[in-house]
Amino acid sequence: GDEKRPWECCDIAMCTRSIPPICRCVDKVDRCSDACKDCEETEDNRHVCFDTYIGDPGPTCHDD
């Protein structure tokens, strides 16, 4: 599982309960990371990456 995550970081990850989990990141970002294949523009000129990633969704973008 050395696949690059389709996002640099993720605050709102939605993952299945399977092992390993299959995750999507529903963050709205200014632009998708280079690794994202399926990047959709939102109504407010932001972007959401619709790629899925198998495994840990990685670090959050914002520390509370």
Swiss-Prot record:
Keywords, comma-separated and alphabetical: Disulfide bond, Protease inhibitor, Serine protease inhibitor
Keyword Membrane in annotation: no
Keyword rRNA-binding: no
GO CC terms: extracellular region
Alphabetical list of InterPro entries matching this protein: Bowman-Birk_prot_inh, Prot_inh_BBI
Reactive bond for trypsin (site feature) positions: R17, S18
Disulfide bonds: C9-C61, C10-C25, C15-C23, C32-C39, C36-C49
A Gene Ontology molecular function term of the record: serine-type endopeptidase inhibitor activity
Family: Belongs to the Bowman-Birk serine protease inhibitor family.
Protein name (database record): Bowman-Birk type trypsin inhibitor TI1
